[in-house]
Amino acid sequence: MNITILSGGTGTPKLIQGFKEIIPNEDISVIVNTGEDTYIGDIYLSPDIDTVLYTFSDLINDETWYGLKGDTFICHEQLKKFGFDEVLKIGDKDRALKMHKASSLKNGVPMSEIVDIERKSLSLKSKIYPMSNERVESKVLIEENNEKILLKFHDFWIFRKGNAKVLDIFYENSNYAKAADGVIKAIEESDFILIGPSNPITSIGPILSISEIKNALKEKLVFAVSPIVGENPVSGPAGTLMNAKGYPVSAVGVYEYYKDIVDVLVLDNSDINKKKDINCEVLYANTIMKTIDDKITLARNILDYYKSR
């Protein structure tokens, strides 16, 4: 059995932790959001790619869901002495990965090749693909003091902590971007696709904004796990961003966002009253993943439902 997972943010990596315990890792492919990627000085941040790499290698700092557990911060502290105070605290080993990306990109190496080098360096059996080798940037249009300002998502979330009146979200360059090498083949060869419980707008939306990928998904069986329980996102700015795009902050809003491609929507048990407004199959489960057992159970519920169809 082969499955392909669409991932971004922190919700989907938690579910990946469950899947990698119950199926052979070589049967898992992951297509990862790169809409939040950005340069900071001489390093290249690709937060969602790095989180997936660290998740599969059991190195992820699962308290912050960013960077490596047990990392040191010697470089970060030294930069502070020079008056360069990084808003995002980057560990030394994590910085090396980001330096590798920056150097490779400047030398013309495609992102898909860079990620594969890093994957192999960590001895990972699962395939990990950036959504595109071309830059597609998530931009957030905000209003501040009656002025409209267009921000990179990184600036909106890291520097401003999401504290702004959001008017809209755009995926810059998505009209021209192509799927990265291996992405379409992974989709076509999968038994089913899983959209993880990530922010639909800025974690999954950039992937779907590439028409080549979205069209390929329409030909496959697609599961999607709602990242919203009741009327509250499990984490992050999903509520604010869904409102800005005109979707209700609920499982119904998640369905409306994915309705062109989703066949089975996975909802939390507490959202049983939402079924009447959802026009696809619904699987109810505990989608709040606090422990490894929660993650494994949710992964197994999805797998069992697929096998029973």
From Swiss-Prot:
Homodimer. 7,8-didemethyl-8-hydroxy-5-deazariboflavin binds at residues 50, 89. Keywords: Magnesium, Transferase. It comes from the Archaea. Its EC number is 2.7.8.28. Transmembrane segments: none annotated. The gene is cofD. CDD domains: CofD_like. Catalyzes the transfer of the 2-phospholactate moiety from (2S)-lactyl-2-diphospho-5'-guanosine to 7,8-didemethyl-8-hydroxy-5-deazariboflavin (FO) with the formation of oxidized coenzyme F420-0 and GMP. The keyword Transferase applies. SUPFAM superfamilies: CofD-like. Coiled coil: none annotated. One of its GO terms (molecular function) is LPPG:FO 2-phospho-L-lactate transferase activity. This is 2-phospho-L-lactate transferase. Pathway: Cofactor biosynthesis; coenzyme F420 biosynthesis. Pfam families: CofD (PF01933). It catalyses: (2S)-lactyl-2-diphospho-5'-guanosine + 7,8-didemethyl-8-hydroxy-5-deazariboflavin = oxidized coenzyme F420-0 + GMP + H(+). Belongs to the CofD family. The lineage of its organism: Archaea, Methanobacteriati, Methanobacteriota, Methanomada group, Methanococci. Its cofactor is Mg(2+). It is an enzyme of class 2 (transferase). One of its GO terms (biological process) is F420-0 metabolic process. InterPro entries: CofD, CofD-like_dom_sf, FbiA/CofD.
